[in-house]
């Protein structure tokens, strides 16, 4: 079998097929048709894939109320509506994400506001909107939020974000629970307990849970187990100091997100149901060990829901061979996007699966690098891959699993506008975010 024709089901959207002439289709729509209608680069979301992962995650964790979709992975009004319709909650971490959610009429009581440096205006907007929870990240924020809630005449439910000293086995930039970093309050140093005491001393904040997030793209539960042990340990200390009656409302342990996905056919993350069962057992066992009732377990998947069901479609431009030794060369395939729509390879060393999707080729594979159009040597989308030897300008290629942290991390580098985003479902396509134009690029100029 020609491996370059294979579309690994653990990597590509669930509704990916090839038509009778070999063109790759998603939800029954040829990618060539989408490129012709909407242009390239183009993000294509398999709506059924996205929604099915929402439902599977909710079922695995007992209820959509226990699953808070991490908006930072990818958010637009359409996605917010899908999340709402599937019964999940929503985590936002800026006033902008909150504004998008509210624009989509997402129920504010199902929104949680995160962030290590929330401004007064962001906290005020969240309180005014009636968000369900705010995760406080510093003593300064506790004071600010207490004053804002007091001015609004409400008592705001909050969680305290903890730093639990866990080194997740992931990239440094997406590991978030070790001590030397910007998020949370350290359990080991006593800062977390000091924050809990301060919340209890306020008039307008109610502590309802403890939060931890150890990182992203995690495939095993070891880090979660240690994090849960330390979160529950702090909860035990809080109950011991303030008594069971006063602490009865602290009924939630939020272990954050970080559930990994397959970017390559060789990746093998655990099924969500298996992971949920293990996490539930961990929290239950840790609670029993210290004599506490088992709290509600909340998780915050973003990548695990948004990542697998989206591809990025590019048109091939320049193709050139570069000698890498006296006897070998690498095929450099330049496309019409790049690091402005996918910075993850440059930022994290991310790896991807890429395929020729506009036709079938029987040409032998050659080693290749998929690169963008930007004036930057690090503008690499797929560092090491294989392409058919006859790949040529005008071909369409697709990169799989780009639904998380691609559009959301996109930029206007080199004044290249952001791509359009199209959702596909049952043979129909609809535009959910239009392509940025030159007029958009000039819209902020004052003269």
Swiss-Prot record:
Catalysed conversion reaction: meso-2,6-diaminopimelate + H(+) = L-lysine + CO2
Enzyme Commission code(s) on record: 4.1.1.20
Binding site for pyridoxal 5'-phosphate: 258, 300-303, 405
Cofactor section: pyridoxal 5'-phosphate
InterPro entries linked: Ala_racemase/Decarboxylase_C, DAP_deCOOHase_LysA, De-COase2_C, De-COase2_CS, De-COase2_N, De-COase2_pyr-phos_BS, Orn/DAP/Arg_de-COase, PLP-binding_barrel
GO molecular function: diaminopimelate decarboxylase activity; pyridoxal phosphate binding
Modified residues (N6-(pyridoxal phosphate)lysine): 72
GO cellular component: peptidoglycan-based cell wall
Keyword Isomerase applies: no
Transmembrane portions of the chain: none
Pfam family, one: Orn_Arg_deC_N
GO biological-process terms attached to the record: lysine biosynthetic process via diaminopimelate
Annotated residues for binding of substrate: 216, 303, 344, 348, 376, 405
Keyword terms: Amino-acid biosynthesis, Decarboxylase, Disulfide bond, Lyase, Lysine biosynthesis, Pyridoxal phosphate
Pathway: Amino-acid biosynthesis; L-lysine biosynthesis via DAP pathway; L-lysine from DL-2,6-diaminopimelate: step 1/1
Assembly description: Homodimer; disulfide-linked. Can also form homotetramer at higher protein concentrations.
Summary of the function given for this chain in its UniProt record: Specifically catalyzes the decarboxylation of meso-diaminopimelate (meso-DAP) to L-lysine. Is essential for the viability of M.tuberculosis in the host.
Additional notes on this entry: Was identified as a high-confidence drug target.
Family: Belongs to the Orn/Lys/Arg decarboxylase class-II family. LysA subfamily.
Protein name stated in the entry: Diaminopimelate decarboxylase
Source lineage: Bacteria, Bacillati, Actinomycetota, Actinomycetes, Mycobacteriales
Gene name in the database record: lysA
